[in-house]
């Protein structure tokens, strides 16, 4: 296994301490936030329907697992997870049971958006996961799912919505989030020790 510590981008002292042990920069991540007051216009795509799912339904969780594994399979650090491990993660997280949405294209599931209750005490929504199957990247489905997640957070009465992003994500997620109105609030970097 590989140790990959995360460090706040502003914490040069801690970064230098890790560097003394041979650790180097690997990736940068942003926490992004957007103030929300009115629901965005959800992009309509011919043949695409977005609807909430029932996370207590084992078949829908299995489908979500399949979508996740496909959507993130080319992402940095991706490691396949077996369905049972996925079910455990779903059961043990702060998932808002009404805040998981699937996109269906011509009746076939092609993407998902998952909102969390993690920051409810701060009156802030959190979009924890957003994924679109590889063959549907660049079709606008990700933007429609993101807008659905934002609208859901507005319906909960939140003042803002937050998400995290790998700035090196090859899918163009950072560009999408900026386009929709998210701004970087903080940044952290992931370090690693190169093999000798």
What are these regions (language model features)?
Residues 1-49, 187-193:
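Acyl-donor-binding surface of acyltransferase catalytic domains
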Residues 1-9, 153-165:
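Conserved GNAT acetyl-CoA-binding A-motif
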Residues 8, 133, 137, 166:
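Residue-level recognition of the GNAT/N-acetyltransferase active site
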Residues 49-66:
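A short beta-loop-alpha structural element at the N-terminal edge
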Residues 75-132:
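A conserved beta-strand-loop-helix scaffold within acyl/acetyltransferase catalytic domains
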Residues 132, 138-155, 174-179:
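Conserved acetyl-CoA-binding loop-helix of GNAT-fold acetyltransferases
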Residues 146, 169-173, 190-195:
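Short glycine/proline-centered loop/turn elements that form peptide/ligand docking sites
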């Amino acid at each position: 296994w590989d140790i990959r510590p995360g460090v706040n981008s502003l914490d040069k002292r801690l970064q230098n301490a890790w560097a003394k042990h041979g650790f180097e920069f690997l990736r940068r991540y942003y926490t992004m936030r957007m103030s929300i007051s009115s629901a965005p216009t959800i992009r309509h795509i011919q043949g695409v329907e977005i609807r909430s799912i029932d996370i207590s339904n084992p078949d829908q969780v299995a489908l979500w697992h399949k979508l996740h594994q496909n959507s993130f399979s080319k992402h940095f650090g991706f490691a396949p997870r077996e369905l049972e491990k996925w079910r455990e993660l779903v059961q043990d997280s702060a998932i808002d049971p009404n805040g998981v949405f699937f996109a269906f294209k011509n009746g076939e599931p092609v993407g998902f958006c998952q909102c969390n209750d993690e920051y409810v005490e701060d009156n802030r929504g959190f979009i924890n996961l957003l994924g679109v199957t590889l063959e549907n990247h660049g079709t606008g489905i990700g933007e429609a799912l993101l807008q659905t997640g934002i609208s859901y957070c507005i319906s909960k009465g939140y003042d803002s919505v937050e998400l995290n992003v790998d700035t090196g994500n090859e899918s163009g997620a950072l560009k999408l989030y900026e386009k929709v109105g998210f701004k970087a609030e903080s940044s952290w970097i992931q370090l690693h020790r190169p093999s000798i």
